[in-house]
């Protein structure tokens, strides 16, 4: 719609997809968990098909694996029915498996029953990102790396101050992930949330045990908790991962247990929303911390549905950090959030399934820009 416009992408790292986009389970989500009518539900359903179509068009390897959500006790069987109803409302094709049918599909997985989700897939989202960058540059776009944003202001357009100079633009879109609240604050607005970093620790199983499952295996989630639980995921590179957990990190880019950033810690521990969140989930907070420090505890969560896993099967694998948006009252933001200014739009909250939803999110941003210009 704007063929004469110039577009630049400012990337603070030396290359793309080094953080949340490149450090995740690689799952093309179907949209099982999300509140009907929410942006997450809509964009995930659209993104599932759009991501696969993009991969096919540009010859990016992916697999349509499907996914099993396994109930290991009667409480989870009950929650399974609620999840099935949500799938129905979100128009997600599913099949209910009995204990025997689950055993037939996955001989090494135990459970009382399962939900079979047919449209889930596996891909390397970093490869999608690099393909998008190549297409962007080929279309005349400009990509600046090692370009840390240090200021953002508005007056007759937007001015972005960076480590390599200043950029002026008619409109700015901020997709800063773990630093989204800081971008909003640069505009002079006080965000309704703060980003709290939760490290997701993964393990991979040895090569000889990679065939222990054929599909992604997830537990039935507890709707009272903000995370999905530890799962098994056959990755696009052939590895099989166990995880992630969700433990508070001491740095927004803290990928190791003792990685610390003083600024991040001051902002986090000075935020009332952190303590209200912990008070809301005291048991899970302590359990996640314990399992991060004590591998046998981590293992037990996976052994509930995959008893063949042993402690020696948990081999090192890179961690990720999830940008969790939390309000001052301790409540987590459940849906995608976009914060508008006169000449700017900041993606404020974009946790999972944002990678799956990336193409619909991009279309939504373009539509918002058209309205604002």
Which residues fall in each region the model found?
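Glycine-rich FAD pyrophosphate-binding loop
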Residues: 2-23
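Proline-centered flexible-loop/turn and helix-kink motifs
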Residues: 3, 56, 107, 307-310
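Dinucleotide-binding Rossmann-like beta1-alpha1 core, especially the glycine-rich loop
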Residues: 27-101, 111, 229-230, 239-241, ...
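Short beta-strand to alpha-helix junction loop
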Residues: 35-46, 70-80, 115-135, 144, ...
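A short coil-to-beta-strand element that immediately follows conserved catalytic motifs
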Residues: 62-65, 192-198, 309-318
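Helical element adjacent to the flavin cofactor pocket in flavoenzyme catalytic cores
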Residues: 115-171, 175-182, 357-370
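Flavin-dependent oxidoreductases
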Residues: 152-261
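C-terminal catalytic lobe of FAD-dependent flavoproteins
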Residues: 257-259, 263, 268-373
